[in-house]
Each structure stands twice: as C-alpha cells, then as structure tokens.
Amino acid sequence: MRRLNRRKTLSLVKELDAFPKVPDSYVETSASGGTVSLIAFTTMALLTIMEFSVYQDTWMKYEYEVDKDFSSKLRINIDITVAMKCHYVGADVLDLAETMVASADGLAYEPALFDLSPQQREWQRMLQLIQSRLQEEHSLQDVIFKSAFKSASTALPPREDDSSLTPDACRIHGHLYVNKVAGNFHITVGKAIPHPRGHAHLAALVNHDSYNFSHRIDHLSFGELVPGIINPLDGTEKIAVDHNQMFQYFITVVPTKLHTYKISADTHQFSVTERERIINHAAGSHGVSGIFMKYDLSSLMVTVTEEHMPFWQFFVRLCGIIGGIFSTTGMLHGIGKFIVEIICCRFRLGSYKPVRSVPFADGHTDNHLPLLENNTH
C-alpha cells in the first residue's frame, strides 16, 4: 500500500515537471543555432561582468532633516598663513548671540615663510586643480567622501629647502569651539582685548606701512576633523595690493553626518562667497583692514550614507539577464529561421515540378499528382 502511494506521488510530481527533458535523438542542431548560441553566451558573459562591477560599487545616499542639536559646540579647524609678523596680528571669534569673544586658546601663532617651496607650491597647484574640478563635477564629492581616511593627507607638506631664512609671515593654526550660532572669525592688526561692550584690537602700536593681509588658507573646516576631505577654501591664496585691504568670506555651514564603510563622523560642509575691497574712508569705503570670515549655520542637517547593492538584488538581476537573453535570442532565432524558410526554402529549384498528366495501365490519367524522378505513382 505504501509503495502504491509512493508511485502515485512520484507520478504526480513527474506530471508537474515544468522542465521536460527531450531525448537527444529528437534534437536537431544547425549552424545558425550554434551561431546564435555563441552570440548569446558572449552577451551573457559581458553583461554578467558589467553587473558584477555594479554590484561591487557603492553610492552615496543623501537624506535631509531639521537640525535639532543647538546645545553642542561647533569646532572650527584653522590653518592660515598671513604675510605679517606674529606680534602684529590677532585672531579671535565674535559670537553674535552673546556679543562676546570666544576663547582663542586653541590657536597657535608660529613664525613662517609666506613663499612656498617648490614642493609646497606643487601641492598647492594640485589642490587648486582639484578645487576647480569640484566646481565643475559635483559628483567627485562622493568619491572624496568614500576615500576619506584612506587617501593621502591633504595637509601642507614640510619645506624641503633651507629653513634658516628669516620668517616674514605668521602661521595661525589650531581649533576653536564656539556656540552653534552665527559668528565672525577675523584676523586683523593687533592683539584682541575683551571689554564689557565687546572687544577691541591694539592696532595703535603697529605701523600702518606694516599692514599686509596677503594670506594663504591651507585648511579651514567645521566640525570633526576628517583626513582626506577637501574643503572649499583649502589651497586659497590672496595677495593684497594695498595696505588697507579687507578680505571677506561669507560662509554657510551645513551640519553633515557622514557614514561610510570606512568611517562614521559628524562633520560640516559649507559654501562660501568671497569679496575683497580697499578701505578708503574718503571715498565712502569704510571698514577695518583684515581677514573676516562671517559664518552662519543652516537649519537643515544632511546625512550622507554609503550604500551597497544587496546580494539578493544582484542575484535577481543576474537571473533576469540570463533568462532574458535566452528567451530573446531563442525567439529571434525562431523568427529569423521562419522568414528564411518562407523566402528561400519554399521556392527552391527542383523541389516541386509542374503538374502533368500521368497515364496508367488501365487507361485513366492523374492530373493532380507531381511527376517524381522515376515517373512512378
């Protein structure tokens, strides 16, 4: 009884077979079929390789939301070289919310040479070239995000020539922590001194002819310092043509959470608008000579996440490629073979001959049958 049930079950399963096997003796091969098969297999191989390269690649997904974090501090990373002696200039941040000077203890003043060495100049040209390409090809920013922490350092390389030359500039570098509100980071003549109504700079002790706010921004970023990330002002160099010259940078900072397969960091992107003018009170151009970076924070936060195609999606796409090519090439081969048979095979010379009367021994004739080779019925 069990054997009978097993046979019935096996017979039922065989009837449900959606892939019946055709014996080889009933299969007819042809040169056209072999050619189409070679084309199909080649196409499948090429598309499979291309699909695998897509599977290996990653892309950046951007999501936007309102920034709800107002209690934390904003970090400003600075590395600027000014073409003046260190005891002539002072740098600080004016917080517009509290109208007070933020602590500048994190900044270091280091005597330096303003002119770059040949190796440093080559580094600067390369950085400026990357900046120009980023202006044209915005998708390169995704490549920079994915290569963070594994690419070469973007810091200015040390000098390789004689370092015994007398320093003629001041390198101001370090970081500051400020409130997450609009502010003004500036470098001007004289050291900053706080007082109840704000702050002031001791500029009276500096000779006016010593003013030279030519500067080079080797690095300026907001948030966590992420090696390998190139910021909009990195590599910028400005040469002052007058002692009373003001350089202004209007910066909009966008909080950014970066999540890749290499790092996870809270950083900030920013856009900048530059302006420079000569201070001339007689002509109505008022102001203070110096370098002013006025920044404001966006209310939106951007989350940048590196994503990868899941394996199940890759498998489904691969099956679609293989099955689609098999079905399409088989259908095209069948249509082509059918057309060729209609045009050529139905009208081959010698396959059929005109119908003629065929006499038989009993005296009747047959006018409907073709005449075969031996004139036999």
From Swiss-Prot:
Regions of this protein lying in the Cytoplasmic compartment: 1-33, 341-377
Transmembrane segments: 34-54, 320-340
InterPro entries hit by this protein: Erv, Erv_C, Erv_N
Alphabetic keyword roster: Cytoplasm, Endoplasmic reticulum, ER-Golgi transport, Golgi apparatus, Membrane, Nucleus, Transmembrane, Transmembrane helix, Transport
Domain of life according to the entry: Eukaryota
Stretches of the chain found on the membrane's Lumenal side: 55-319
GO annotation terms (biological process): endoplasmic reticulum to Golgi vesicle-mediated transport; retrograde vesicle-mediated transport, Golgi to endoplasmic reticulum
Membrane topology term: Multi-pass membrane protein
Transmembrane listed as a keyword: yes
GO-annotated cellular components: endoplasmic reticulum membrane; endoplasmic reticulum-Golgi intermediate compartment; endoplasmic reticulum-Golgi intermediate compartment membrane; Golgi apparatus; nucleolus; retrograde transporter complex, Golgi to ER
Primary subcellular site in the record, as a coarse category: endoplasmic reticulum
Compartment annotation: Endoplasmic reticulum-Golgi intermediate compartment membrane; Golgi apparatus, cis-Golgi network membrane; Endoplasmic reticulum membrane; Cytoplasm
Record note on quaternary structure: May form a heteromeric complex composed of ERGIC1, ERGIC2 and ERGIC3. Interacts with ERGIC3, the interaction is required for the stable expression of both proteins. May interact with EEF1A1.
Function in brief: Possible role in transport between endoplasmic reticulum and Golgi.
Family according to the record: Belongs to the ERGIC family.
PANTHER family, alphabetized: ENDOPLASMIC RETICULUM-GOLGI INTERMEDIATE COMPARTMENT PROTEIN, ENDOPLASMIC RETICULUM-GOLGI INTERMEDIATE COMPARTMENT PROTEIN 2
Protein name: Endoplasmic reticulum-Golgi intermediate compartment protein 2
Organism phylogeny: Eukaryota, Metazoa, Chordata, Craniata, Vertebrata
